[in-house]
Amino acid sequence: MYRLVWSSLFSRSAKRFSQSHPELRQRFAQVLRDIENDPLQPHLRLHSLKGRMQGLHAVSVTYNYRVTLTLNVTEQEIILHDVGAHDEVYE
């Protein structure tokens, strides 16, 4: 099991995401639980990012929405950075 660390940006974006997408609140909460239990589960579609976001990873909430994160396997820690639409989090 991993420890989730919410960055200040993630706290703001998670609140905004939940308010603007109430229909996805349960799905978002389930994704966070799944990340905490095992971020390598295939349905999360964990992938590393490239370019200026190199060093970060992303998982899917739905087809259009992503959570960006830093995965520290040795420390069993995941730092959550942002959540939002594909184009928003990859800007």
Segments (PLM) and residue ranges:
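Short, charged low-complexity linear motifs
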Residues: 2-3, 51
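Enriched for short, Lys/Arg-rich terminal
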Residues: 3, 12-25, 61-91
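PIN-domain endoribonuclease scaffold, especially VapC-family toxins
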Residues: 5, 25-33
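Residue-level recognition of oxygen-bearing side chains
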Residues: 9, 54, 88
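Short alpha-helical linear motifs
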Residues: 30, 51-54, 69-72
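A short, surface-exposed loop/turn module that caps and links secondary-structure elements
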Residues: 34-59
